[in-house]
């Protein structure tokens, strides 16, 4: 008997899994592969990516289709981004538009899949019609909130104006397109409440954040029992072309690190993540900071394992941070701002330490470096907590069940309703 068919539309190619959204989506699809649905994944890709990542794709879908994209030069890319800022759409959405993608997705919808999943609200721009039944949008964040927080933290008036304009455009886009889907999946109860109260979405449900314990747990170990009294090794992981992560590292560099270095002049920080801005790397070098920017790495685990503490000095963000659970799965003590742990059901003091000012962040880091057993106990508590509740397998089962309930049945012959796109 043929399995029900699920069409999964992603506005980004999912490999390498070097960003939180890719990691989250890939983990869910991997957990669903071979289950209730036959999965067709549709996304952009260069001509070589499907061949290069054939094994990874086979682990997350039964069939992969793509619309072709080509890598653009720096000048052309900059011009595209400038044009996107002038669009009536949010810039990040305008950059995802593709007539080829829309035609491909329309062809796939004509085959009447049982469920259609749009990954991120951005994917709505790729549909000329969203089926009124059997349609699901998977929201990783409240996107407008991210822009609002950038506007709040930006020191440059022009930057504040740009971020503010993007917030307004994204809020309009979310309010218009999220209710077009039969179901909205959020990654936290906080996001869920926002969608229900602000945008009036229907059929909204929440899934927890998960982590791949088979992968991260394989290299997990207790943190070092002794830390050099003048040093200590901290780590931050995240895509360093993502503005929120850039802001976090700038904040750490300018306000937190000087307070740490006074007491521990040999302390060091490793920043793991793709494409760190050259200006940021140069600034760390010019200041003589004991920092390492790795750029993209194939495996983040050895870097986390070698650190004494995992820090998350985020001032901007949305949704939930998978990186928190990855650090906890490797038994590393976590120090984070409130935004860093937002939406995660973890307990302050028992699972992580919270610090929302530069002085508090530096003081908390120094306290844990001075008392490694305290950090080790907290890390073990966090490890046990998420191991029992938040594996990717459990999250994938929840996601699959939501999609099963959304599957088209008696009403599949209803004509789809058009979704007019702005911009």
What kind of region is each of these model predictions?
Residues 11, 75-94, 136-172, 239:
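Acceptor-binding helix/loop patch of EC 2.4 sugar-transfer enzymes
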Residues 148, 211-227, 281:
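Acidic anion/phosphate-binding donor-loop and adjacent secondary structure
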Residues 182, 305-319, 330-333:
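Acidic donor-binding loop of glycosyltransferase active sites
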Residues 190, 207-210:
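Carbohydrate-associated surface elements
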Residues 264-302:
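Nucleotide-activated donor-binding/catalytic signature segment of Leloir-type glycosyltransferases, i.e.
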Residues 323-326, 333-337:
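Short hydrophobic beta-strand element within catalytic cores of glycosyltransferases
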Residues 352-359, 367-372:
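Conserved acidic donor-binding segment of nucleotide-sugar-dependent glycosyltransferases
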Residues 374-388, 395:
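A short, well-ordered alpha-helix in the C-terminal region of glycosyltransferases
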């Amino acid at each position: 008997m043929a399995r029900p068919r699920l069409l999964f539309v992603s506005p980004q190619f999912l490999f390498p899994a070097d960003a939180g959204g890719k990691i989250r989506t890939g983990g869910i699809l991997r957990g669903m592969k071979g289950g209730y649905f036959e999965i067709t994944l549709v996304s952009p890709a260069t001509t070589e990516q499907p061949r290069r990542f054939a094994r990874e794709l086979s682990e997350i879908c039964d069939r992969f289709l793509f619309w072709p994209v080509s890598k653009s030069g720096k000048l052309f890319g900059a011009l595209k981004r400038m044009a996107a800022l002038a669009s009536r759409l949010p810039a990040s959405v305008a950059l995802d538009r593709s007539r080829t993608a829309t035609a491909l997705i329309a062809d796939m919808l004509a085959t009447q899949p049982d469920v259609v999943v749009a990954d991120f609200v951005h994917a709505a721009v790729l549909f000329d019609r969203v089926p009124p039944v059997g349609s699901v949008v998977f929201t990783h964040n409240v996107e407008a909130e991210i822009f609002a927080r950038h506007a709040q933290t930006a020191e440059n008036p022009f930057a504040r104006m740009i971020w503010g304009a993007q917030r307004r455009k994204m809020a309009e886009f979310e309010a218009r397109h999220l209710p077009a889907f039969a179901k909205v999946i959020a990654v936290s109860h906080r996001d869920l409440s926002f969608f229900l109260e602000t945008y009036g979405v229907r059929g909204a449900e929440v899934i927890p954040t998960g982590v791949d314990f088979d992968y991260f747990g394989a290299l997990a170990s207790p943190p070092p029992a002794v830390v050099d009294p003048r040093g200590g090794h901290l780590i931050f992981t995240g895509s360093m072309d993502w503005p929120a992560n850039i802001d976090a590292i700038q904040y750490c560099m300018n306000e937190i690190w000087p307070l740490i270095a006074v007491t521990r002049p040999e302390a060091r920080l490793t920043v793991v993540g793709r494409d760190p801005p050259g200006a940021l790397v140069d600034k760390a070098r010019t200041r003589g900071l004991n920092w390492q920017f790795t750029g993209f790495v194939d495996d983040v685990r050895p870097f986390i394992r070698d650190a004494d503490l995992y820090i998350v000095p985020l001032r901007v963000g949305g949704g939930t941070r998978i990186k928190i659970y990855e650090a906890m799965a490797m038994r590393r003590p976590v120090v984070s701002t409130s935004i860093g742990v937002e939406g995660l059901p973890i307990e302050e003091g028992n699972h992580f330490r919270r610090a929302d000012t530069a002085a508090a962040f530096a003081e908390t880091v120094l306290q844990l470096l001075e008392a490694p057993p305290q950090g080790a106990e907290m890390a073990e508590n966090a490890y046990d907590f998420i191991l029992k509740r938040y594996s990717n397998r459990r999250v994938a089962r929840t996601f699959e069940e939501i999609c099963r309930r959304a599957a088209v049945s008696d009403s599949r012959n209803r004509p789809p309703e058009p979704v007019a796109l702005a911009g």
